[in-house]
């Protein structure tokens, strides 16, 4: 298998004006809810001018989600909004009337009583759920797949969760959490969907939309827009949410989107490759350093969005993520340094690797049509959520599959 394998999506449809769940009012409601959270700030959209010159393109932007609410990752956006929506249903109130200050009030706690939220996670989503539950004075239970980082486990426990590492891969840890939720009448807050469980995953995806809302607002101020967007995918919830907004906002002028996954958990790539319009799973240990992308079963909601609107999927060796981590950690000239973790850096790693090795990917590079007018957008979805691992990769060149 090559360091990067690519496949073109042959099932793309023409956009007809709406993507269910991502209408203008829904997205506005999400952003307003997040703006009510303590210490809300837009995360930086960093213009890497020197890297753009090096790669022969007009612009390279990287959105740095390590700055999100002090949690070092973007996932709290989905966890917080979905829990807010859960509570709005329980309280029979529109979420617009339940900003954070109201949700965390003694009056609301009295109405709700004691609740427990449960989820499975590689780290970032579980930490976001635990953070929100703690602020609501509610309980959270978090299951992690085997091989998860002790540092990520401790970060979740520090948010007050009953968190533990299981003997299962990610997808089976999700099934375990779902069983426990049913047995104990807990609320399952999972960032992937399956038949019969779609409402909360959609709310989580809507929560992620704040990232792209912030990006588009900032780019509109300087009258710029991306031509190519590299989006990492695990189950596809993040990528699907970003794709939905790109398609909704830009319509016929939407950028080319490239979905990036690890070789060991490339379910979107394999689904594109099958070319039958259906999601296809990847079984086994899902071995990769990209822990946040180590998922083998596509989210059924996001799959339909990616199938209908995303242009390409890449299956990447772990060295591609490592490349991205190092590129962002050791910037050119006056470019700003970005601390990007294993799951955050694969997009920029893929782009730079393709540029530097375009002779090995002539057909793909030609299809991408990247030139000196191209504007590249990547989203670094996490910082150094496992500081020891990050340092070992960036300083020493060590990583598990090396």
Predicted regions and their residues:
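PLP-dependent amino-acid enzyme catalytic core
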Residues: 1-402
